Amino acid sequence: MSQIIDALVIGGGPAGLGAALGLCRQNHSVVLLDSVSYRNTIDTIPDNRMHMVATWDHRRPDEFRVAARKELQRYERFKYREVEVVSVRQTTSTQSGKLEALFNAKAADGTEYAARKLILATGVKDVFPKIEGFSECWAKGMYVLSPNSNELCIARETKYRSFHCLFCHGYEDRNSESVGVLAVGECAETSTVARMARAAHQFSRSITIYTNGNSELGDQVYRLLGKEGWCSINNLGIKKVYMPQKTPASPITVQVELSDGTTKTEDFLVHKPATVQASALYTQLGLQLTAEGDIKVKEPMFETSKAGVFAVGDCASPNKFVSSASTSGGFAAAGAAMQLQAGF
């Protein structure tokens, strides 16, 4: 068996980096394994920016990760590797001279690790609605509004029109003329639609809510917002969404093609897609999920349904913000450290 470490952190985003830092501050041995796959990494967008993080507002998320890893390098008991973890299991060992529960993880390169505590910071993946063109517009002409979503959106200077969170992004588009809200999937709920529309109105003169043929939802939303002069509701089906070819004389927009053949131009669209776990490691450990699909944890220390295993960040919370992810990592580090120091 390989040398036993105090804690293994799987995932190198804000949550995993925060957990590693907290454990380092208590002088524990920590290995962080990073698959280098992040929810806010979009290859087609050269100038991705993050927001809602004090001291790092409107800066690149990849630079944030580099800076955090650089800070961790001064801790002599910390190690970082860019490798995906393919399997993890719980076992026992007497290697330290006493019987203790361990977690064994195997990386894609065959390297194995044994740790007393395990922290999962493995993130989530977005599940897009079945609307033609949506994935091509995602994070290019579409914001997602939710106080429960991590930064993924792109600012105006990226010249794209599809975004993810109007707290994290949207300010750069505050002078828009018309914005569309896609009330489909998890967003097809009256109070959610109303909240999205009101927030989008902070950045646009007018809002169109697209229900994609759900006239019942449209009627419910109308009762809430129908008297607002800035809001209109479209109950036609959506055939596709797309971004027209940009020319020097044209603004960057998103086109919504409807079932009757008409097309509506929007400065950007707003939608919150569903998410699923980005890693299957939780299944190998038999961890419980919430009804929303997040790993079930006990706050404030973010321990899962299995003792000694913690889950932090997007994979374990509806609040998918960078700042809340980093904070959850710190709480899990405290919980793991207390258990290690108490000998359990």
From Swiss-Prot:
<feature type="binding site">
    <location>
        <begin position="321"/>
        <end position="322"/>
    </location>
    <ligand>
        <name>FAD</name>
    </ligand>
</feature>
<dbReference type="GO" id="GO:0097237">
    <property type="term" value="P:cellular response to toxic substance"/>
</dbReference>
<dbReference type="Pfam" id="PF07992">
    <property type="entry name" value="Pyr_redox_2"/>
</dbReference>
<keyword id="KW-0285">Flavoprotein</keyword>
<comment type="similarity">
    <text>Belongs to the class-II pyridine nucleotide-disulfide oxidoreductase family.</text>
</comment>
<dbReference type="GO" id="GO:0016491">
    <property type="term" value="F:oxidoreductase activity"/>
</dbReference>
<keyword id="KW-1015">Disulfide bond</keyword>
<comment type="function">
    <text>Thioredoxin reductase; part of the gene cluster that mediates the biosynthesis of gramillins A and B, bicyclic lipopeptides that induce cell death in maize leaves but not in wheat leaves. The nonribosomal peptide synthetase GRA1 incorporates respectively a glutamic adic (Glu), a leucine (Leu), a serine (Ser), a hydroxyglutamine (HOGln), a 2-amino decanoic acid, and 2 cysteins (CysB and CysA). The biosynthesis of 2-amino decanoic acid incorporated in gramillins could be initiated by a fatty acid synthase composed of the alpha and beta subunits FGSG_00036 and FGSG_11656.</text>
</comment>
<keyword id="KW-0843">Virulence</keyword>
<dbReference type="InterPro" id="IPR050097">
    <property type="entry name" value="Ferredoxin-NADP_redctase_2"/>
</dbReference>
<feature type="binding site">
    <location>
        <position position="51"/>
    </location>
    <ligand>
        <name>FAD</name>
    </ligand>
</feature>
<feature type="binding site">
    <location>
        <position position="314"/>
    </location>
    <ligand>
        <name>FAD</name>
    </ligand>
</feature>
<keyword id="KW-0560">Oxidoreductase</keyword>
<keyword id="KW-0274">FAD</keyword>
<feature type="binding site">
    <location>
        <position position="121"/>
    </location>
    <ligand>
        <name>FAD</name>
    </ligand>
</feature>
<feature type="binding site">
    <location>
        <begin position="34"/>
        <end position="39"/>
    </location>
    <ligand>
        <name>FAD</name>
    </ligand>
</feature>
<comment type="subunit">
    <text>Homodimer.</text>
</comment>
<keyword id="KW-0676">Redox-active center</keyword>
<dbReference type="InterPro" id="IPR023753">
    <property type="entry name" value="FAD/NAD-binding_dom"/>
</dbReference>
<comment type="pathway">
    <text>Mycotoxin biosynthesis.</text>
</comment>
<feature type="disulfide bond" description="Redox-active">
    <location>
        <begin position="165"/>
        <end position="168"/>
    </location>
</feature>
<feature type="binding site">
    <location>
        <begin position="12"/>
        <end position="15"/>
    </location>
    <ligand>
        <name>FAD</name>
    </ligand>
</feature>
<dbReference type="InterPro" id="IPR036188">
    <property type="entry name" value="FAD/NAD-bd_sf"/>
</dbReference>
<keyword id="KW-0521">NADP</keyword>
<protein>
    <recommendedName>
        <fullName>Thioredoxin reductase FGSG_00043</fullName>
        <ecNumber>1.8.1.-</ecNumber>
    </recommendedName>
</protein>
